[in-house]
């Protein structure tokens, strides 16, 4: 929850007016005195109301919009062109926008196009047109445009057509160029299109497994594209790319305290075959002098929900494991969108078990390829990825030396069946509504809490936050309690309840490192690594 303050930049004085209970979503109108902001629902903590505030005036703020459907997230921003204030509404399967001329802050917001089930899109403005990335009749999205005076869907015209093997993600508009961020073969690429000639090219990143994205580009009339690049061995790096000469200029690279030599580390992209024949990409990183011709300790991570793709990025924290001989691997399982929208649809609702089976099959592939063995294989996931961990240790309890389930969503049926729990109704498109029998039966068949049996589980660390509003603290607690009642053998089961943390851990710049240290201490102890 944010408080909004206003400061006079000429005098340096902070104005006494303060706005509380905000999401932090703010947009200035062009009169430099009107601001639009989003307030939170005190129970669900969702942004649900958009207000207009006049800086320096004592009149009450005016409510511009109230979203009463709690399956939607809402906010407000200003278009890059500076011409429009834009209210956005997004749920699991729906996007919706309202626009207002930023020169007329006292006007009325106009809906961009009628809200439609299963229609997801994003908008940007340049000159006198809106550009739209949409899944309308395009599973992996296409790019369209329309006049800013006629924005309903019947007026949209295609700019870039749908491609079955390419997932169009985002765009950046320039006067002479159009930049498209897209995913092909599971990797994010940046495509540069010359608006005049129509010629296009791609930036060569020079690595096999990486991630990249368009950074902040405030100007239209420039030939420089600013983007960010990272890989499992390359720290986050900001570049300016000349779209005419194709020359790169490194502007900044994150410093690794204590020194870092990327030449000591190697990354790979390998592919496992799922039990249904689908391909599962796996990204790995290890220290070259530690990866000997014998199985190593290996930490396998995945998330696999909400269409969120876990790209291979650099982590200085991870070096602590790599320098001690661990291999770190990301299984790009279904439930994310590694191969486009179909990957997501194949890992949600009544296809959710594909997420778990992909993770298990990725682990078995790593064993088969002799990167590790079960006695050295560890699993990790958090939140919805914690559900993944809870499921895979039920399916294959003897496959793992240890497992970390962070703030895990493990009591799926109970949570999804209770619409009074904040955020539940907004999750039904992802997991299904167990008040319907087909969803209930399927969800019950994999729900980690409900599928606990009297068996020997791997060593486990389960973490939770007392102030977690997304996975309430009692969910991991009851899960661990039931595990203890069913626990066989002599493996260790730890519960860490952080009494100061929410879903994303403790606030503060450095406090999260204590949580990393706890997880790594668990792994190193099991691996017999003492220093």
Features from the language model and the residues they span:
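Conserved loop/turn motif of beta-propeller repeat scaffolds
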Residues: 1, 32, 82, 127, ...
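Active-site-proximal cap/loop segments of hydrolase catalytic domains
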Residues: 330-531
